[in-house]
From Swiss-Prot:
Annotated positions binding S-adenosyl-L-methionine: S33, G34, H35, D53, F80, D101, Q108
Catalytic activity as recorded in UniProt: cytidine(1402) in 16S rRNA + S-adenosyl-L-methionine = N(4)-methylcytidine(1402) in 16S rRNA + S-adenosyl-L-homocysteine + H(+)
Organism expressing this protein natively: Desulforapulum autotrophicum (strain ATCC 43914 / DSM 3382 / VKM B-1955 / HRM2)
Function as written in the Swiss-Prot or TrEMBL entry: Specifically methylates the N4 position of cytidine in position 1402 (C1402) of 16S rRNA.
Gene: rsmH
Protein name (record): Ribosomal RNA small subunit methyltransferase H
């Protein structure tokens, strides 16, 4: 099966990483390998690309894409939060560029048959790594109403979380909810028509986002990554992180800011006693957004936010 995907902000990522021949880079979320192809071209002939993805479809696609370049490429079917262990297995102490693209691929939405989208008729699964056990159907059919409310509000910032959770619990009492289209219709029916008409997005968007985040423990994995990545970035090396919703972007922004700050002593201390030094410097003050031209060509890019920083 062809892996269908269009990389987001390819020029901005290429310029942000600013890779040179002979360097080592990591693409933490290969997806369709679009960014990875550009990165490998920049570090050849003697450089190295390390590609990671938890989706087996993306891994199989990467092996096809890089079939003639495996002397310079290492591919791992794993989660990006395990970057320290992956680099250790290769005997690599530091890299010159890291890319983390947190978005879903078009392939996952349209051809994955895993219920990521509220369109079509697919199993309510939402696992990115099919080796894991928990599915979205498990959450929807087994969690107490209060727990569903918490997930929808915390991970989807859904204001109608109580009404939606109540509707789900009422519906599943008759029969389990097992298809994406079933859940999408339950959510749509639970929200007052006036609010539905006012929304610019599908009424089930935030609920599906929240379930996907919960199933894949996305924010936990991101937190683990943000705590450790700087330890493996060579001086002068760059990191690019593309996020697609405010929860992720706030986490990235806070971590970059903390690493830029260095000293954590109270402001009224006459001198630093903590010993922390700045370890990172943001390349741009604000997140980079896709151009209107790119959004017209690739509507999935509309909510993307790119943050770039370099290792001091």
């Amino acid at each position: 099966m062809k892996f269908e995907h269009r990389s987001v902000m390819p020029r901005e990522v290429r310029d942000g990483l600013d890779l040179k021949p002979g360097e080592t880079c990591v693409d933490c979320t290969l997806g369709g390998s679009g960014h990875a192809v550009t990165s490998l071209a920049a570090v050849l002939p003697n450089g190295r690309l390390i590609g990671i993805d938890q989706d087996l479809d993306a891994i199989e696609n990467a092996h096809r894409v890089f079939a003639d370049d495996m002397a310079n490429v290492s591919i791992f079917h794993d989660n990006f939060s395990h970057l320290p262990a992956i680099l250790d297995s290769l005997g690599i102490k530091g890299v010159d560029g890291i890319l983390l693209d947190l978005g879903l691929s078009l392939h996952q939405l349209r051809k994955g048959q895993r219920g990521f989208s509220f369109k079509g008729d697919e199993p309510l699964d939402m696992r990115m790594d099919m080796r894991t056990a928990l599915t979205a159907a498990d959450l929807v059919n087994t969690l107490e109403e209060r727990a569903l409310v918490d997930i929808f509000f915390k991970y989807g910032e859904e204001k109608m979380s109580r009404k939606i959770a109540r509707a789900i619990v009422r519906q599943r009492a008759s029969a389990p909810i097992t298809r994406n289209c079933e859940l999408a219709e339950i959510v749509r029916a639970a929200i007052p028509a006036k609010i539905v008409h006012q929304q610019k997005i599908h009424p089930a968007t935030r609920v599906f986002q929240a379930l996907r985040i919960s199933v894949n423990r996305e924010l936990e994995q991101l937190e683990r990554f943000l705590e450790t990545f700087v330890d493996f970035l060579n001086p002068g090396g760059r990191i690019c992180i593309i996020s697609f919703h405010s929860l992720e972007d706030r986490m990235v922004k806070r971590r970059f800011r903390a690493l830029e700050q260095g000293c954590t002593c109270p402001r009224d201390f006459p001198e630093c006693v903590c010993g922390f030094k700045p370890r990172l410097k943001s390349v741009t003050k604000r997140a980079v957004m896709p151009t209107p031209e790119e959004i017209e060509i690739n509507p999935m890019a509309r909510s993307a936010r790119l943050r770039v920083a370099w290792r001091v």
